[in-house]
């Protein structure tokens, strides 16, 4: 069975193939399938956004489509950046991290010292016959004072995983 990976993010493609490659069988990127689409992620939750993308790509290709939506939720910022994680600053990863750290500094100035956070990831697999499977998971940690570690993408350099004992 062929499955379309409903993302234009090459980092996500790499991670999905590393984690789920054998379980999914043959996977195609949007580029490999000749699909030029970037559905608007306007859902209120990670699951809604994952479903929006998977449904649209499944509709366009008539193949099963796997999508994810993930983001960082910081307790001191009332869950921000949340579902807007990738678009938090209006720029790229470095700008998003800079804005996140600045907003945490402002929160600390107001007496809010909690830096706990979690990453949420929702995945959706949509089939041409209308079946939909979703799942959501979280990993917990806190935000560091500055970027650390090597590799990763997005907020990985500032998210310290309490489970792993290091930044992503």
Show the residue positions of the predicted features:
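Anionic-ligand binding patches
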Residues: 2-4, 10-168
